[in-house]
Amino acid sequence: MVIIYSASWCAPCKYAKKLLDDKNINYKEIDIEKADINRQELQKLTGGLTVPQIIINNKCIGGFDNLLMLDQTGKLQELL
């Protein structure tokens, strides 16, 4: 299961969702503004303060750059 903590104004969030969409990987998006999650709560949930924060099978991998690196090295599929 993939979960993305995102915000509507966040460009890297859009890039992350596009990458997952292009690879036909299902994910659950949690908009931190709509869910009323502040940065401290986000850090407790994910370990990170910024969006996106991406969780794959209960492991937080970080943001878009980390997701892209995992994809480019072929390790993304291993985590799924």
Residues covered by each model-derived region:
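Local sequence-structure signature of Cys/Sec-based thiol-disulfide redox active-site neighborhoods
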Residues: 1-26
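Thiol-based oxidoreductase modules, predominantly thioredoxin-like and allied folds used
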Residues: 26-39
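Short amphipathic alpha-helix with an adjacent loop that forms part of the alpha/beta core around
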Residues: 39-45, 76
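Thiol/disulfide oxidoreductase modules built on the thioredoxin-like
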Residues: 43-50, 68
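Short alpha-helical
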Residues: 11, 36-37, 62
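Non-catalytic, surface beta->alpha helical segment in thiol-disulfide oxidoreductase systems
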Residues: 56-80
